[in-house]
Amino acid sequence: NPDTIFTLPSLVNGYVAKAKTDADRAMLTAFEAELYASIYQDNMWRYNRVDAPLLPLPDDIAKWSAAQFAYKLNELYTEALRLAKADNKPLADYKNDVEYGKETLDYIPDIYSFILYRKVENLSEFNEKFYDRTKLQTACDEGAAMYAAGSPEAIYWQCTKIRRAPGYRHYDEYLDLYKANIGKPGAPYALAQAMNENYESFEPEANATADERNEQIAKRDSMIALPKQAIAKYPTFY
């Protein structure tokens, strides 16, 4: 039944008070936020067109506006982060409850940073009209500040801040971050982001001028050269 999803957030909310630890409550609250995010993303075109006062939130989630979803997500993530800060646990403790990639723990080792990551990812789906996106930049700064400069965790958050910044191409910013951290544990991640960014612009557009074409080719060549230089300089690091 498609309507079942609208009942799931309140169902999960009912388990929050029954949880035995703040860490469990934090993860359940974040899961509740995830459900609201999923509802919004499945039909965002519809919710984006709803014009309604921010508060009170309608009992019927199907009648919410995009701004109301953003408000609710921000509220839930704020509470989840408060709980996680009081009882931060390794994310690996929840390996049976949360799906994550093999390298995730290198960058997001604990539940606080995981919840912060999900906050940034889900609230980034809202445009500036519905959510102040400068708050995403602030959240990334918070994430980076939790870890040692140049560490994989700190570089991850700095790259996330770059990725969520206005604009579509951030190659130069990733490259500058990499160069500023050469020799530090997080440098490979920044380099990988620069490479991924440049892969997307390998081929000059059909209507590109000669100067634009040469600039794109030069960036491509610099991308190919960077890993070779890095491996040559730090052979045991990569």
Question: What are the roles of these predicted feature ranges?
Answer:
Residues 1-238:
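Extracytoplasmic/secretory-pathway proteins
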